């Protein structure tokens, strides 16, 4: 509701809940002109049986992910020192959500993922991201190697993350355009 109110369709709140957070959500919905409804507990159990919803659900419009062309069109908006995160074959939705949450906190300008062999942008991903995905520029590409080559052609320094490495990302000198590539949960970085 705060980060991307245009994506919100309807806020559902459980009947009987009255607390400061509940009132804050109603205020946010009103400020953003998002419709809201109160529903019985049974509605929540049927609508979201596998989600710990805490009596609150937000129905959103589908989010369209950018592609290679969109990345190239938006490139100049990132300024002189863009920070790009490239996620190669992150298949676990919770891991993807955690990566997006961290990327948002780190000030990443764009997150690039392959179209195949990656977790889709699901409710689990978005919940794990805790709002961190809402204002990130998310890009899905057909060919990660080609996209990396294009980034290098734009002067981007491409680094690969290593679980056994000794340098922590926030202590390295990353002046200038930088892209950090993170590999899959099980195999790490693949040869691109």
Regions found by a protein language model. Give the residues of each.
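Amphipathic alpha-helical repeat scaffolds
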Residues: 1, 91-98, 143
């Amino acid at each position: 509701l705060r980060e991307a109110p245009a994506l919100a369709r309807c806020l559902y709140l459980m009947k009987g809940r009255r607390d400061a957070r509940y009132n804050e959500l109603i205020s946010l919905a009103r400020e953003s002109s998002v419709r809201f409804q109160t529903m019985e507990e049974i509605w929540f159990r049927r609508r979201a049986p596998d989600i710990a919803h805490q009596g609150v659900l937000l129905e959103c419009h589908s989010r369209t992910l950018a592609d290679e062309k969109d990345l190239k069109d938006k490139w100049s908006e990132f300024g002189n020192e863009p920070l790009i995160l490239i996620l190669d074959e992150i298949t676990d939705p919770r891991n993807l959500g955690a990566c997006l949450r961290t990327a948002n906190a780190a000030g990443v300008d764009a997150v690039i993922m392959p179209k195949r062999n990656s977790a889709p942008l699901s409710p689990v991903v978005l919940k794990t991201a805790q709002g961190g995905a809402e204002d990130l520029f998310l890009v899905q590409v057909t060919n990660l190697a080609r996209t990396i080559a294009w980034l290098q052609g734009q002067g981007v320094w491409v680094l690969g993350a290593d679980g056994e490495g000794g340098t922590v990302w926030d202590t390295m000198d990353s002046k200038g355009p930088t892209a950090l590539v993170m590999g899959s949960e099980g195999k790490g970085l693949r040869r691109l």
